[in-house]
Amino acid sequence: MKPRIWTFELRKGSQVLEHFSCTCPDCHRKGDALATRIGSVDCYAYNEPLNRWQKMGTYRGHYMFTDGFGKERRIKDDYSGMATMRKEVTV
């Protein structure tokens, strides 16, 4: 079975940063990479039956940190502290 191709936009506020068509896992990679570089970005997908854009979620980036003992941590988005790194999807 062929994976479904969707049309996505990554936005920061009302500004469109990227517009592309791909599968959902590819969108996760692009959104995470962009959010890691410039901060949180919103992901919108085009809903063809409704003929409109729908917000799918917000990518916040990785903000990873490895401490002196080799433990991976994630800096919180507001830089208020540290959290232990977990594998998770933010969308």
Protein language model regions, located:
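A short, charged, amphipathic alpha-helix used as a generic interaction element across diverse proteins
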Residues: 23-42
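Short aromatic-glycine-(Arg/Gly/Cys) micro-motifs in beta-strand/loop hairpins
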Residues: 2-15
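A short, exposed loop/beta-hairpin motif centered on an aromatic-Gly-Thr core
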Residues: 14-26
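Short, mixed-charge low-complexity intrinsically disordered segments
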Residues: 36-91
